[in-house]
Every structure is written in C-alpha cells, then in structure tokens.
Amino acid sequence: KYTDANDNGKWDDFREPEEFSAYIQNTFEVPWMVINYGVRIDMVDYNSQVWSDTLGKFSPGRPWFYSDLNDNDVWDRGIEEASDIAGLARQKIMLKNSNWSYKISPRVGFSHVITDKSTFTFNYGLYFQNPIYQNVYLNTNSLEDPEELFEEGEGAVGNATMNAQRTQQYGASFNVQVGENWAYSVGAWVRDMDQLTRYTFERSGVYQYQVASNGDYGSAKGLDLTLEFRWAFFGSQLQYTYSVAKTNSEYAWASISGQYVDAPSQENLAYYDRPHDLTYYLYTFLPGGIQAGLTAFYQSGYPYTPIIFRGKDPAEDARHPNSKRGPAYKNVNLSFSKYFQMMDHKFSLGLNFFNLLDIRNAWDIYALTGKPDDPGTYYTNYVGLPGTDPNGAGVYADKSSAYYDRPWRLSSPREINFFIRIDFD
C-alpha cells in the first residue's frame, strides 16, 4: 500500500512538477516616444501532497490526525475523532493534493525624446521565480508519519503551497549627448524583493520543527552614472554605481541553525552588497595598426559579521551582522592586438596583461582581523613546535608554521599572455 502523490497509478521515489508559462509583448512607436509593454503568466503544480485540517484547507505548518476506525482512509466527520495532537487510536494523517498556482507579471518601459540630443527612459517590471524544489519537497516522503519525520528528518519540512518569489523593479534615467564627442547618463533604480523562501519554527505536540514558507524579504536601490567620450581613433567610458542592498536573512536555510526569537525581523546589509562600483575602459589605435585597450575596475569589499571576544574565546557578533567590510577589489588589464592578412587568411597577434599592477585581492578573509593572511594572535599562538609556548601566551602549540599558509585566499598575480589567431575562410 502506498500514497500516489504523483497521481500516476504507481509507486515512485520522485516528484514530477508541472510548469507552464506564456507572455505577450508589443511595441508602440511614435516619432517622440517608444513604448514596450507586455504581460507574462507563470503557473506551477508541484504534484505533491500537503498536510490539511478538518475543514479541508491546507495546513503546511501543522499536521492533523484522525482515528480511522473503519480503515477506509477517509475521515468520517462526526464519527471519528480528529486532533492536531498525535496519539489517537488507529491514527492516520490528513493530506491534500497540491493545486495549480499562477502569477501574472506586467512589464512596461518607454523612452521619450526631450530634445534632439536627450531622452528620458523609464522601466517597470514585476518578476516571479519559483522556489527551489529542494525547499518544496524536503522530507515530504514522510508526511504520513510526522512523528518519524520530526525525529529523524532533522526537523525540516518542505511546503508545496509556497508562492513564487516576487521582485518589483523600477528604473529611470536621463541620457544626454553633449557636442559631437561626449555623452552622459544619470539613472536610478529600486528593487523590492519579498515572498522569499525561509524556514519558520512550528510546534506539534512535544515536537518543534521548521517548515519552508514565503517569509523573507529584501531591497536594493542604486544610482548609475555614465560618462562617455568617442573620437575617430579614441574612445573611453567611465561607469559608476552607488547601491545599497539589504535583506532580513542571507539565504533560505539561514534560519535552520538559528535561534528562535519572538521579535520583528529587520533588514541588514546583504552579503552581496557592494556600495561602490567603478569601471573605466578606453581603446585607441597606435601607429602600425596596433589596437590597444585598457580596463580598470574598483569594487567595494563584501560585508561580513565580525568576530568579538566573549570572555576568553572569540564568537560571532550576532547583534551586528555584516557590520564590517572586507578589502576592496581592484584590477587593471591592458591588451594590444594587430590584425593583418596573408595567403588569403586573416591573422592576429596579441599581448594581454592581466592584473597589470600585480594587485593581490582578497577572496576570503578571517573575520577576527579582516585580513586574508592573518587569522589573529588568538590562533597564531598555537603555531610552533609541539608542546611549546612560543609566544608566552600560556597556550601550547599544536600547529605547524605552514598551517595558515593559504594562498588561495588571494587572487592570482600578474599574468602576461601572448596569442596568435588564424581565421580560415
């Protein structure tokens, strides 16, 4: 005997979700304005089962039990007892098949001519993304036995009633040409994210567990500036973005190992927040038909939660998540190339300098010091000859001097590549 969750007439150890999407898009043009507009529909049925209550409604956070006295796999209302606490005679669980859910997302954008050398653009879009299936189906093969699930399934349950994650985005910009060679643009954008996946604490009898749900949220906003210069043999562009990204949780599973707090959530800097982003590139033609290009890039470091001392031992500063920032990323690349034709074939020779200034950027850091190559004296005090106290700190060394030599925490040094390319007709 088995539960046919896929409704395909046989037992299987997988799920077969169904997705459907369609969109309509159109463009309206007049001499002074262009409008793009459209609408999209997304539908999904996870083809799974969900706990339900005595009213036949979904109850993904709490199982309901009933006494199946006549063993017909159906709760006979008014005859058989039902409760949200386990322990009934001939106990069975109330389940309900998942349904189709749909989301409609409109998008619109327009570009309006202000003068013969300036335009104004605006865009709005509503976007949906289905949750990761892992968070939908996690441990749902044990829904019929909640007690076993709570005891052996690490207390986490998927949820086939979750909605798609939603993002609303607005953006506007002015684009202006100055003279024959210069142009600039100023733009601003806002992105609101909600209905993101998280795990919420639930209780059933003596058991405490976590159920996937749409509870997390975040936001991002930014300002874009672009300055461009073009000439017959020279061109360059400078792009700068200032932005702030915040979320109430770093990722869906962050609450799995967290401590339950009965208090309103709040936004903190997202782990991918980079407030300053600066890019510059130029290209030109040198004597002899040589093309040259240079790119330079600067980006703020990522935020991280600092390590503080609570007594003698270090611990994560949970009260101030992502309150410190790692080193910034900096890079400069230079390239030269020359094209010529010989024997009815096109040839090109080139020389690329990656990381021209030989800057060793930090990919990862130690949260105690904020440095990629120094974990802090609390840890380096254990480096030395075994059984000795090399720094007089009252601790005995048990690690070699190479233990914290981890070059992969830094980016690659300068790299010079020479190449030859042949194009065959």
Locations of regions flagged by a protein language model:
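Signature of Gram-negative outer-membrane beta-barrel scaffolds
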Residues: 1-115, 131
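Residues that define the transmembrane beta-barrel architecture of outer-membrane proteins
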Residues: 16-20, 100-104, 166-170, 219-221, ...
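Residue-level signature of outer-membrane beta-barrel architecture
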Residues: 26-30, 41, 102, 110-113, ...
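Outer-membrane beta-barrel channels and translocator barrels
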Residues: 30-33, 113-117, 167, 179, ...
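Transmembrane beta-strands of outer-membrane beta-barrel proteins
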Residues: 35-39, 120-122, 184-186, 236-238, ...
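Gram-negative outer-membrane beta-barrel transporters
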Residues: 44, 181-306, 421
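Membrane-embedded beta-barrel scaffold of Gram-negative outer-membrane proteins
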Residues: 113, 119-121, 125, 131, ...
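C-terminal beta-signal and adjacent terminal beta-strands/loops
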Residues: 289-313, 329, 338-425
